[in-house]
Amino acid sequence: MRSIALMLALSSCVTPSSSDTPHDDPYHSTALKWHQGSIEDAFKQAKKERKLVFLYWGAKWCPPCNELKAQVFSQPRFAELMTSSVPVYLDGDSEYAQIWGELLQVSGYPTILLLTDEKKELMRISESLTYDEFAATYLDAVSGDHTGFSERLEAGISGKATPQQWRLLAYGSWYGTRNLDLHSDLMLEKRMKLIANVPTRLKVEKAILSAELLKSAAEISRDSAIVRKLRTQAVKYLDSFLDSDETIFAARTTIIYSMKPILNWAFGKNQQTIKEQSRKRWLAAAEKIRGKPELSVDTRLWGWYPEIETYEMDLPKSKASLPELQVKVRDATIAADSSATSDFERQAVISGAAHLLGRVELYDEAAELLLREAKKSVYPYYYYSSLSQLEKKRGDTNKSLVYSKKASQSATGKSTKIQWLVQDINMLISTPAADKAQQISGLLEQVYNQIFAQKDGFSGRSYRSLKRLSKMLSSYPLDSTTSKKLKGYSLRCSRLEKRAQVRCSDHFSEILK
């Protein structure tokens, strides 16, 4: 986490107003009154009332955010839980939101922070948790010794962490803050020492930490001494979270989404027997996750993803088993569609259901599901984007472009609009299309009109969208008319505040070089 002094200095560059925080989202708990003033006002209130600041960073359209609302915010007990905090909802499309995102070092939706009135971070959660998991972690952060992440990490490595600190180390997110290089040899070694010190009775905490360590290791391509050592101990770490129903439940995110790269990383050609044994354990664990009624509809549906992953691992010899897998996935998506009754559940479930259908080549059913949902959703652009990708996958270029355009034109919210416009440009660049140059020119005009109309257009997620755009356009031959337009926009950089001015100039320099 950046120093408090730096955060306060940067925050003084903007003058947050009451519009910093949007009004109540109708999908949030009706029992809880979210803070309606500026972010700074929330910290002032927390100091005055001797409370903490509970800050939720999200977007109304994002599926994981809606799962969080279904699992946690909508629960009757949530409002009571928040009595020790000032609850703040920072929507990524609200005024100054992306500047605040950088100050607080949050980017991915959703992220939950628990902060002192001096902005010291006590908790960060980005994973999907049940209400009970969330409540226990939150209460540990509130009632504990108020140590930060680095202090907890060192306490764990030295074997002096308290039970509350162990829980926060396990359930708290390690990503997106504190400038940690989770893939460095030093950090891998620290994490191995940390896991070795977890008390025997804390099986759940050890399971989560072990699963996250293997996930990080599987993302590494180098072959250092510590990586080789970790690979030789992979089975031990797998045992930590595949050993029981309790540990499987705790490490479900890794089990669902990350086991394929873990197994490929851990086991070479001479270890096929143990790899196959581990794969069977993986599939058995996924089956248990699917049968957990405490989990959200979305998580139980994604419990079928390992079945798809193992099918794809065995291609082409597994092709004969596709019809059987299609039946399983179809039945699962129908059940999820039926079970997801609230708006936030549907926003969390439907795009994932369509993705799983597409992965087993049930393209028509996936398209039908997405089209049906787009017609009744207040966020149709999310489904149109999925439709665009689906049609591109099955080779219908025209439909792919039509849905991509529908997505970008129906998108709302300042940062969201930029993100979807850039996606549409990317689709045009990567796909054969008539009058491509003219369409791209028109979309670029929309992007820059949006960017320069915003006070945080060169910050946070909006700036990340611009960096993706720079990369696309740096290798794309712009026509003279479009180049002239971009040079005109680049002249507006000098009107921005200093940091945005530098980023703006760098952006156009990359494109127009």
Show which residues each predicted segment covers:
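Thioredoxin-like thiol-disulfide oxidoreductase module
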Residues: 39-47, 70-127, 133-141
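Generic helix N-cap/helix-start motif at coil->alpha-helix transitions
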Residues: 161-167, 201-212, 246-262, 293-312, ...
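Conserved redox-active cysteine motifs that mediate thiol-disulfide chemistry
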Residues: 57-71
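Structural motif corresponding to the intra-repeat A-B loop/turn of tetratricopeptide repeats
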Residues: 360, 394, 431-434
